[in-house]
Amino acid sequence: LYIIYFITAQGWTMREITLLAPAKVNFSIDVTGRLENGFHTVEMILQSIDLCDIVTAEKTQKGVSVSCAQHYVPNDQRNIAWKAADAFFKACPEQGGAHITIKKNIPVSSGLAGGSTDAAGVLKALNRLYGEHLSREKLLGLARGLGSDVAFCLEGGTQLARGTGDELTALPDLPGVNLVLVKPDY
């Protein structure tokens, strides 16, 4: 967690924050049913891992912008990180705006929740940057509105996920588990 403060006439003010957004793995998944909307209900054991994207949020006067060096990651409202920032500012309309920078380390389309963890990172960063206006419950509500994995990525750790994957129960940390990830180039 990196925080940059600036001195203003009113004292120190936070201008920018950088944090790690960890990937997740599914240790188990059981499909328990199907909803009318076509989604399946599940029970899963999920785990945050040390592979992380880096998310930086910088205060701006208004609006949302996103930048990511990888050409295949959209830098507009198609990006879930942009959607997360937009949701935050709709929930806190009295706040300003933000420029979000994402450094991708999590492979895209790998099932490791790279986009979801970036969205969760944006919610955490903006809430911290703008003075913790939203409670944990409110942040989880925003996360659930963005996608099932976003709620898990906001909480992290080891979790039992039920429903569509966004009903979470914390589990004890898994002791001494070593994990090797392999991502083929195809």
Specify the residue positions occupied by each region the protein language model found.
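ATP-dependent small-molecule kinase catalytic core of the GHMP/sugar-kinase superfamily
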Residues: R15-L20, N26-M44, E132-Y186
